[in-house]
Amino acid sequence: MTLPPAYVDELNLLNREVTTKQPTDILRFCADYFNERLAKREEADDDGPRSKPLGGGFREPGFGSSSRSTDGSLFRSSFADTSSEGPGSASSEPAAPFTRRTSVSAESIAPGAFAGAASGVASNNLSAEQLESLYKSVSHNFLFGNLDEEACRSVLQSLQEKKCDSGEKIITQGDEGDYFYIVESGAVEFIKDGVKVNSSGPGSSFGELALMYNAPRAATVVATQPCVLWSLDRVTFRKILLDGTHQRRSMYDGFLKEVPILSDLGSYERNKLADALTSQVVEPGTAVITEGEAGDAFYLVESGEAEVTKKGESGVVATLKQGDYFGEVALLNDLPRQATVTAKTKLKVATLGKDGFQRLLGPVLDHLKENDPTK
């Protein structure tokens, strides 16, 4: 049997990359390589007619992806096949041994395929008070806790209002799940196999796993008072997060190329580093790190300015701007912080934890040590 020429060409290209880069994690390298190839193809497709239907790429969250988030990954932990619909954790009962697993599935969505999708989603007209209340409701939810400000705003603007009368079924046990709900007012109860297992009111949410998989509902949810709910469907949620993940990786890749100390990193190393970074916004006058404290993170300045001060030295000893870095000394030498860094303007930094610092910055650790100000 003759192999397809396109397949042979792809393998030859991959072999060339592997020979050149000599990666230690071959599986991750191949996954990142094909992700990048697919992303470039999607960008090229945006300039002309698509030759394939929307969503025909690899399965979300990514080819060869692990349980950790790329966007930080989308999801940090593994879950049961059925959703625990709300605080009642209706699926928390131990499953009978050797029972057949309930299958779940999710749409195949290629990163970048929905570029600008968030702007195309119908926007609601939430008041400032409603936005604040809804933000508090979702900020502690495991699916939303790692969203950056822009992605969270897109999610909130995509919520659709749903009003329910007392006694109305909102979801039914066993039905396919496709919506997540936040309770703005009223009360609901959770019923599993005909038995009430819990209830909740304003500020609570339920149906999270519907945003990940079209899994069967684990419980029935009934309004016990007239309710105002805000709902989000799975496809919209995944569009927002996947588009955000793709844009975030592209943004960090461009940013990391401009950081002088990281100039020796190849695209493979930059992609791994970009996936591990998290953004943090610091208000003016707030200390990012404080002299004498233990260090657990490395920082890169994305935007804004910060001032460096040291005990025993008068005034500002240095001003940090976009592309500058700090916090490496404590991680290189297991020392307390050697200076205090305070935001001069609104500051946005990319942070990398100690484990990631040592694991992902191997190629540039020698440069960091050479520039170690404590020597």
Swiss-Prot record:
GO cellular component term of the entry, any: nucleus
Chain residue ranges for the region called Disordered: 41-102
Source organism of this protein record: Yarrowia lipolytica (strain CLIB 122 / E 150)
Gene: PKAR
Positions of post-translational Phosphoserine modification: 103
Protein's UniProt name: cAMP-dependent protein kinase regulatory subunit
Family, per entry: Belongs to the cAMP-dependent kinase regulatory chain family.
SMART domains: cNMP, RIIa
Binding site for 3',5'-cyclic AMP 1: 143-258
A biological process term (GO) from this entry: cellular response to nitrogen starvation
A Pfam family annotated for this UniProt entry: cNMP_binding
Positions contributing to 3',5'-cyclic AMP 2 binding: 261-375
UniProt keyword terms in alphabetical order: cAMP, cAMP-binding, Nucleotide-binding, Phosphoprotein, Repeat
One function term, GO molecular function aspect: protein kinase A catalytic subunit binding
